[in-house]
Regions:
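A short acidic, Gly/Pro-enriched loop at the edge of an enzyme's catalytic core
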Residues: 104-115
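Conserved Class I S-adenosyl-L-methionine
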Residues: 59-61, 179-269
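Class I SAM-dependent methyltransferase SAM/SAH-binding core
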Residues: 53-55, 59-106
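A short glycine-rich, Lys/Arg-flanked "PGG" loop and its adjoining helix->strand segment in the class I
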Residues: 128-143
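Conserved class I S-adenosyl-L-methionine
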Residues: 2-48, 61-65, 84-87, 145-168
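A short SAM/SAH-binding and catalytic strip from SAM-dependent methyltransferases
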Residues: 114-127
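A short hydrophobic/small-residue beta-strand
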Residues: 144-145, 200
């Protein structure tokens, strides 16, 4: 779910708390991300005995699905958010080995046969560095299957949130802030993957509009989580309410997903 420390602002909290997530709530509200992950997992070609990496494991719901695909293998789960790593390890126990790491600085006990990632790469500012780190973690001919936010992702919602952030009592807290997201284009992503040593590359954008029946906990935990980092606690409820009022009901999020399928260059051993 989260993969890099460089995107968040430093005006609230310590580096650890500032970059953390509410793992318990995310585990409950992330049904859209889990549904997309189930689709993407079908793209992996696995026998069942591979060593695989979940790059940006979040609360571990998707990691559990991945572990089911390799009953005779092992899953490494990496996330930059301490609460997510703790939640994943507690939920899955010996089925996985979870590490709190920046994805651009991966250090795993061994090379992996495949890397899977869901709803994470758009949190990483430096995609060339990310893809180089992933390639280094893979065995030759290892698979990369990923999906993240792509160019145009929730543009309408982010525009509304920016309008609220620039107004009234909220404005001083967002002065000069541009947000941590990196919603990349498919063609540029393919070029970066190739430069990092990947081959058999396929990248494409996919609109996935999503309506939320209970939007408040979702936007608080997912869409506005980094906005709220900048606000004092007493302003958080009014900020969320103002954004949701502008967005209207039912809340339709104009998600655009960037799909990635590739292999590390080289011959399988």
């Amino acid at each position: 779910m989260s993969g890099h420390t460089g995107g968040a602002d430093q005006r609230k909290g310590t580096p650890a708390t500032r970059l953390d997530w509410d793992a318990g709530t995310y585990d409950r509200v992330s049904a859209p991300q889990q549904a997309w992950a189930r689709e993407q997992l079908q793209r992996l070609q696995l026998r069942g005995d591979e060593v695989v990496l979940d790059a940006g494991c979040g609360s571990g719901k998707v990691t559990a699905m991945l572990a089911d695909l390799v009953p005779d293998g092992h899953v490494y789960a990496v996330d930059v958010a301490p609460s997510m790593v703790e939640h994943t390890q507690q939920a899955l126990g010996p089925r996985v080995s979870a590490f709190c790491q920046d994805l651009t600085e991966l250090t795993l006990p061994e090379p992996v046969d495949a890397i899977f990632s869901n709803a994470t790469f758009h949190w990483v500012p430096d995609h060339p560095r990310l893809f180089a780190a992933l390639a280094a973690a893979l065995r030759p001919a290892g698979q990369l299957v990923a999906q993240c936010g792509g160019f145009g992702n929730i543009d309408r919602f982010r525009t509304l949130a920016d309008e609220v952030a620039r107004g009234g009592e909220f404005a001083p807290y967002f002065a000069g802030w541009k947000g941590p997201w990196n919603y990349a284009r498919a063609d540029i992503t393919a070029e970066r993957l190739s430069a990092a040593g990947f081959t058999d590359i396929d990248t494409w954008l996919e609109p996935r509009p999503t309506t939320l029946a209970d939007p408040e906990p979702f936007v608080r935990t997912v869409c506005l989580v980094r906005h709220l980092d900048l606000l004092p606690a007493e302003l958080e409820p009014s900020f969320i309410s103002a954004v949701l009022a502008r967005a209207g009901t039912p809340l339709l999020l104009d998600y655009v997903r960037l799909n990635i399928v590739a292999r590390r260059a080289g011959e399988a051993r």
